[in-house]
């Protein structure tokens, strides 16, 4: 199936991948060139894992996981395969985020630095917890087969909305964290004097912001949504199911030969309205 605005989508996707990759490279260059490298000994070198893993996992990989359903060359793949890829990318992002949080707490505890006093730490920990809950609920409800269809229909809009909110929160938290680190670390020369490290990390923040904006734009364009699979089951919040229009119409016609034309026309119209309304809840925005 052809995608509307295919080349525009490719341009935005390529831009997002480029900016996201540059964000990861900038984070690595920052800690390796300006912050003396990486380690796992409780020192500042261990803390340096925090920005690298957060930018790599919680920003870049999570962003790719959000838009993976929208890649048109995957539309011929089964929905189960795409769900597995989506869940796998989010699981990798979650693991990297957890390791980065552990690095911060270990560094603070070894050096007797207080934990969880800044807004960055509050919002960041909330984002990690919500992300883990989102991952667990998504795996349990949408990937495993035993969840009732009515539960999936009810949770799908919540899953989509909360995923976008969490990603936006992560972007904001990353920007707060970069600024906080520069204020604490840059003393001579001070951050206010535009030192090279300050300018470099500010640029990293802009890259993260642009990456987030591109992901938001891609994931909110309805014309780039993964098309509904033929003969797929549409979920009703009341627990019922409806087959895709092509697969259901012949059976419908055969079972209603005794009905009048007016009754058939009214039921067909009602069914089309229900399909249009329910399809929004069935297909993930992502």
UniProtKB/Swiss-Prot annotation:
Gene3D superfamilies: 1.20.120.1770. It comes from Homo sapiens (Human). It is found in: Cell membrane; Apical cell membrane. One of its GO terms (biological process) is intracellular iron ion homeostasis. Present in erythrocyte membranes (at protein level). Also expressed in respiratory epithelium. GO terms for cellular component: apical plasma membrane; brush border membrane; extracellular exosome; lysosomal membrane; membrane; plasma membrane. Residues 229-268 are annotated as: Disordered. Induction: By iron deficiency (at protein level). This is Plasma membrane ascorbate-dependent reductase CYBRD1. GO terms for molecular function: identical protein binding; metal ion binding; oxidoreductase activity; oxidoreductase activity, acting on metal ions; transmembrane ascorbate ferrireductase activity; transmembrane monodehydroascorbate reductase activity. PANTHER family: CYTOCHROME B561-RELATED, PLASMA MEMBRANE ASCORBATE-DEPENDENT REDUCTASE CYBRD1.
């Amino acid at each position: 199936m052809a995608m509307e605005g295919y080349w525009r989508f490719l341009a935005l996707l390529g831009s997002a991948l480029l900016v996201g990759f540059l964000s990861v490279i900038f984070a690595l260059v920052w800690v390796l060139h300006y912050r003396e490298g990486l380690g796992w000994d409780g020192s500042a070198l261990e803390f340096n894992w925090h920005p690298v893993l957060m930018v790599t996992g919680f920003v870049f990989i999570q962003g790719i996981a959000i838009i993976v359903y929208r890649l048109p060359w995957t539309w011929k793949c089964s929905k189960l395969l795409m769900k597995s890829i989506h869940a796998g990318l989010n699981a990798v992002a979650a693991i990297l985020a957890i390791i980065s949080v552990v690095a911060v707490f270990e560094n603070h505890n070894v050096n007797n630095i207080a934990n969880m006093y800044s807004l960055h730490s509050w919002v960041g920990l909330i984002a990690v917890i919500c992300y883990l809950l989102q991952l667990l609920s998504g795996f349990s409800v949408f990937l495993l087969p035993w969840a009732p269809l009515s539960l999936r229909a009810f949770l799908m809009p919540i899953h989509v909305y909360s995923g976008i909110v969490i990603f936006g929160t992560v972007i904001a938290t990353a920007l707060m964290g970069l600024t906080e680190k520069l204020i604490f670390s840059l003393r001579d020369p001070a951050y206010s004097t535009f030192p090279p490290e300050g300018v470099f990390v500010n640029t990293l923040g802009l890259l993260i912001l642009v990456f987030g904006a591109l992901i938001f734009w891609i994931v909110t364009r309805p014309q780039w949504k993964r098309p509904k699979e033929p003969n797929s089951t549409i979920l009703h919040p009341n627990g019922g199911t409806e087959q895709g229009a092509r697969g259901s119409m012949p059976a419908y016609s055969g079972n209603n030969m005794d009905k009048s034309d007016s009754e058939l026309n009214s039921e067909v119209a009602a069914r089309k309205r229900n399909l249009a309304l329910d399809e929004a809840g069935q297909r993930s925005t992502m």
